[in-house]
Amino acid sequence: MTPLTTFLGSGTHLITIIMVKETAWKWIDDHRDQLTEICDTIWGYAEYGLCEDKSSRLIADTLSKNGFKVKLGVAGMPTAILAEWGEGRPIIATQGEYDALPGISNKVVPWKEPLVEDGMGHGCGHNIHGTTAMAASIAVRYALEAFGLGGTIRFYGTPAEENFGGKVFMVLDGLYDDVDACISHHPSDMNVAGLSSSNATNGVRFHYYGKTAHAAGNPEMGRSALDAVELMNVGVNYMREHVIQEARIHYVIENGGGQPNVVPDYASSWYYIRAPRRDQVDPIFERVKKIAEGAALMTETELKVDHSGGLYNLIPSRSLSDVVTANMRLVGAPEWSEEDLEFAAEIAKSFTKESKIDGLRKDKVPDWEKYVDVDLVAEILDPWDEGETSAGSTDVADVSWVIPAIEFCTACNVLGAPGHSWQFVACSGSSIGHKSLIFASKTMAGSVLDLMTSPDLLVKAKEEHEKRLEGQVYKPIGDPDRKPPLEQAREIAERLKGKA
């Protein structure tokens, strides 16, 4: 790929791809204030997954006002968006997320000060995530129109990445079947189009049903559902020694009874089971279920297993990484102001240098020593992580099993600060987050335009994708006919509001 590639437009003149990109980038620059306002508005909404009513409506309305054909409520999710402009091939997709996380609300200040006590916050930067994809899609639309170029730009608004994997339902509904390639962006603490995979995961709830009784007067008549939950947890914790080193199993007790003097007749736990590959998760999941059944036998309770689904491991794309990295370098990384650096330095006081070093080493960052005293990364890195597996999981992975896809990162969080934290919330609403947004939007727009105007790039990406799959085929996890858990999401969202 070269930025000097030329091709015929709708007239007789020659067009360079850099001319088309600069048109898209100019639209982003001209609308910088509007884009940051949308980003900040979504930051303020901070809505739970599958309940992102205001955030999704804002994005959908903005796309509609800019000429996109918009469908809101696809794949059985009221907050899922499918919007497109143009016609014909190629069809290039962008993806935007806009769900927030519970318990990490914070003001845009470099210390812990909740905006709402125990409230929701964008501790993974999804206010930036969704706005970036929206902005890039609109910018591409105007660039294509300006030069009379064909093809279709399609925006996917994907709810509930953090809890229910909204993209999975969109994949199962066939909404990606005609797409040629897909580009996503995620705020992070580095500027890189990475090549690591992600952990596959299963999400499952275990519901136990027993009998109530007076815990002091006649406990022999009770059968404690909470005992079953606790015995199951003990069993799983003993099992940890006997699974692969890379596996991760974590849980919360969602319901444990009302008060101590009543034997609880209902209790439940929510588990995540992760491993680097789907075929490693499944056997661990079966063992966890056996432990759950054993706990029910020991306590004479009834068990209901609610396998809410899971996620695949990500299929990386060197071809798409090269395209994105080249566009990152064309755009240039953000320049941090003195105010940005002071803000970041204050946040850096909230964690230790030792934990930062541990993180850099764990992520195998090249020449990690030079980043020990860096708070905001200002350079663009070449991907170093091919063959590695990141600790987290993402529903972008499920998309990557059906089409070539990538999710690149731009620096937004303070280097060394944890994800899903008040620190990330503060950065996501600050000028640091705004600069990450603009950089990412331009990078995504340029990358999409390369794919739309260079057929060879798409051929290369598709050939690599097929090779990496090694003949494996995407199959639904759990019940293929399951529906998004809308009622459950609303109940959780209401409960979280009650805590706030």
Question: How would you name each of these model-derived features?
Answer:
Residues M1-I18:
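N-terminal amphipathic/basic-hydrophobic helices that include classical n-h-c signal peptides
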Residues V20, H31-Q34, I38, C51-T62, ...:
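General structural feature for long, well-ordered alpha-helical segments within catalytic domains
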Residues E230-A500:
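Metal-dependent amide/peptide-bond hydrolase catalytic core
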Residues K71-G73, E161, G194-S198, E386-S390:
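Short Gly/Pro-enriched turn/cap motifs at secondary-structure boundaries
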Residues T79, L101, V109-G121, N127-I128, ...:
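Histidine/acidic-residue-rich, glycine-tolerant segments that coordinate divalent metal ions
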Residues I42, A83, T94, H126, ...:
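Divalent metal-coordination and catalytic microenvironments
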Residues V20-H122, N127, T131-T152:
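Acidic/His- and Gly-rich active-site-bordering loop/insert found
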Residues E47-Y48, Y156-A160, S308-N313:
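Conserved short loop/turn motifs at secondary-structure junctions
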